[in-house]
Design a protein with these regions (language model features):
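Short, low-complexity N-terminal leaders and the immediately following helix N-cap/first helix
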Residues: 1-71, 98
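Short, glycine/charged-enriched hinge/interface segments at domain edges or termini
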Residues: 2, 7, 58-183
């Protein structure tokens, strides 16, 4: 009669007869479909800066304290920041900046109000115009913080995971250029 062994004993028996695959380091673009031979960590914070999570207006919450639908607060639009752009100015009280998704959030602002919920008062919402806000946004509303997707040193692909084409793109965004994979 055959003797039964425990699952742990069976596992140890199988593993004792397996030769681990060797690892090699390859260029990131050659890693798609390969298995990570080590935990892969981000080299940088992704995103490296706080940025607008959607199109809208970068505001200082203090400028909109007390804003309601019955008593909206109007701000002057002083600039427009495109995706990937940076605002270089210094706004005064009562001013805001039109900002696009992905643009760096100027440090003087603490929230982004969606374009769709703002009323145009003068102009078309672009620099030189005025827009009305019917509520004070929450702190950091519609803002993606620096490092929100990955922090420098954070594991972004675990050892033993298959590196997908999407994973290659994400690793590239994390500053990873070469990766250890199994042969």
């Amino acid at each position: 009669m055959t003797k039964m062994i425990s699952l742990e004993e069976a596992r140890e028996l199988v593993l004792s007869r397996v030769t681990p695959l060797e690892a090699e380091t390859v260029d990131l673009l050659d890693a798609a479909g390969r298995v990570a031979a080590a935990d892969l960590k981000s080299d940088i914070d992704v995103s490296p800066f706080a940025h607008a999570a959607m199109d809208g207006y970068a505001v200082r919450r203090c400028d909109l304290a007390g804003a309601t639908a019955e008593s909206p607060i109007t701000l002057e639009v002083i600039d427009e920041v495109p995706a990937g752009g940076v605002f270089e100015g210094t706004p005064q009280a009562g001013q805001c900046v039109r900002i696009m998704t992905g643009a760096a959030l100027p440090g003087c602002f603490d929230a982004v109000v969606k374009y769709e919920i703002v009323s145009m008062v003068e102009g078309d919402g672009k620099p030189g115009g005025r827009v009305a806000f019917s509520a004070q946004p929450k702190e950091r509303d519609n803002v993606r913080e620096a490092g929100e997707e990955a922090r420098a040193g954070e594991i972004v692909v675990n050892k033993g995971e298959v590196i997908t084409t999407a994973g290659v793109g994400f690793l590239a965004g994390c500053g990873v250029l070469r990766v250890p994979v199994y042969r």
